[in-house]
Swiss-Prot record:
<dbReference type="GO" id="GO:0008970">
    <property type="term" value="F:phospholipase A1 activity"/>
</dbReference>
<keyword id="KW-0443">Lipid metabolism</keyword>
<comment type="similarity">
    <text>Belongs to the AB hydrolase superfamily. Lipase family.</text>
</comment>
<keyword id="KW-0442">Lipid degradation</keyword>
<dbReference type="Pfam" id="PF00151">
    <property type="entry name" value="Lipase"/>
</dbReference>
<dbReference type="InterPro" id="IPR029058">
    <property type="entry name" value="AB_hydrolase_fold"/>
</dbReference>
<keyword id="KW-0378">Hydrolase</keyword>
<feature type="disulfide bond">
    <location>
        <begin position="296"/>
        <end position="304"/>
    </location>
</feature>
<dbReference type="GO" id="GO:0016042">
    <property type="term" value="P:lipid catabolic process"/>
</dbReference>
<keyword id="KW-1015">Disulfide bond</keyword>
<dbReference type="GO" id="GO:0002080">
    <property type="term" value="C:acrosomal membrane"/>
</dbReference>
<dbReference type="InterPro" id="IPR033906">
    <property type="entry name" value="Lipase_N"/>
</dbReference>
<comment type="function">
    <text>Hydrolyzes the ester bond of the acyl group attached at the sn-1 position of phosphatidylserines (phospholipase A1 activity) and 1-acyl-2-lysophosphatidylserines (lysophospholipase activity) in the pathway of phosphatidylserines acyl chain remodeling. Cleaves phosphatidylserines exposed on the outer leaflet of the plasma membrane of apoptotic cells producing 2-acyl-1-lysophosphatidylserines, which in turn enhance mast cell activation and histamine production.</text>
</comment>
<dbReference type="GO" id="GO:0005615">
    <property type="term" value="C:extracellular space"/>
</dbReference>
<keyword id="KW-0325">Glycoprotein</keyword>
<feature type="signal peptide">
    <location>
        <begin position="1"/>
        <end position="25"/>
    </location>
</feature>
<feature type="disulfide bond">
    <location>
        <begin position="282"/>
        <end position="293"/>
    </location>
</feature>
Amino acid sequence: MPPGPWESCFWVGGLLLWLSVGSSGDAPPTPQPNCADFQSANLFEGTDLKVQFLLFVPSNPSCGQLVEGSSDLQNSGFNATLGTKLIIHGFRVLGTKPSWIDKFIRTLLLATNANVIAVDWIYGSTGVYFSAVKNVIKLSLEISLFLNKLLVLGVSESSIHIIGVSLGAHVGGMVGQLFGGQLGQITGLDPAGPEYTRASVEERLDAGDALFVEAIHTDTDNLGIRIPVGHVDYFVNGGQDQPGCPTFFYAGYSYLICDHMRAVHLYISALENSCPLMAFPCASYKAFLAGRCLDCFNPFLLSCPRIGLVEQGGVKIEPLPKEVKVYLLTTSSAPYCMHHSLVEFHLKELRNKDTNIEVTFLSSNVTSSSKITIPKQQRYGKGIIAHATPQCQINQVKFKFQSSNRVWKKDRTTIIGKFCTALLPVNDREKMVCLPEPVNLQASVTVSRDLNLACV
C-alpha cells in the first residue's frame, strides 16, 4: 500500500516526540546483573522484525529474564501452574522502550500471582506505521510458536491472557485466532484504528479470538478503532476526548498520544485501586448521558462489566454476547473512578418550551454537574451525573433553571418540581430518593438543598 496521510501523521508524531523528550529526561534504569531489557532501535533501522520474550515473576518483578527456547523456560522462574499474562506493545515511533511498561509489569505482579511475559518487538514496530502493520502476521506466528512451548510445559490454553496495546491488540487477536479462539482472554487497550477499522475479522481483534475478549476504547476519533471488537467494549467518556488530555495541537506529542494511552493508564489504575471502573450497556453515549440506560439487565442479567482482572469482566452469563458497547465516565487523573447517579426533575406543571436545569452535587469542596432537559409538554426529564466521591458523602445539591430569553431581558419565569436521584445501577424505582419538599426555581437563580443519602 502506498504511503498515505497516516504515515505522514506518524512521522510528524515522531518529530514531535523527539522535540519534546528526545533530548532530555531521565536515563532509563540500569538493568540488574543477569537481567535483560528491551531493545532500542531508531527511525532508520527499526523496521526489520526481531523479537524478544522477557519473563517477569512474582519473586523478582523488576528483573526480566530472556526466554527463547524450552530450556530457557525450564531454567527460569516460570511456573506452569500459574496463569500467564502476555503484554504486547504497539507501534513505536522512535524505537524506544514503552514508558509505561515497567509500571504495568510491577502492577500486574502485585495484583495477581502469575507469570508475566513482555513481548519486545521494538525492532519491527519502529519507523513507519505501515511497516509495523506488515510485521503483524510474522510477529503473531512467532508468538504462537513461543506459546506452544508453554503448552508443552503443561500450561493450559485457558490460563493464557494476552494484553495488547494499540497495534499489539490486533497482534493478540491474530495469535488467538491461530489457537482457534481457545486462549483464556484477550484485553485490547485502545486497539489501533488505522488499517483496521475496515479490516475483516480475520485481520483484526475480534470476539472469536479468545474465550473472553474485551477492549477499552479511549481515542476512537484518532488513533484508536471506533468499532466494537470484543465481547465487551468499554467506550470510556464516549471513547474519545479524555478529561485532562490536551485539546490543542500546540501541546505537541501529548496532544497526539494522550487519549490513546489513557486506556493503558486506566487499566493500570484498575489493578492498583479497589474503586470499580464499572460500565453500563447502552446504544450510544448520548443515550447513556440522557439517563436511558440505568442497569445491566440487558444483556448481562444485572452483572455490570468492570475494567480490571475480574473474570470475564464481571459478566456472569453464558453464552457471552458479542460486541456489546458499554459506557462509563472517569476523572482526569488516577484512580479515574467515578460513581454514576441518575438525576430526575418532575415538573408540577407542563410548559410550552423545553426546560433546562443544571444540577450540581457538592461534597468536601468537590463539585459534579449535569444538565437535565425536559422537552416541552412533558412532565419530567433525567440525566446522568458522575461524581468521584460516593453518593452518600454528597451533602448538597444545587439547581439552576437556565433561561432561554435574551441576555438583556430579565427572565422572571419560575418553575416548581420534585427532584429525585439514585445510584446506578437502578434496577427498580424503590432505589430512588427524592427531596422531601418541592423545589422552586427562578430563571438564572441558583438554589441549594441539603441532600441526605444513606450509605449502603
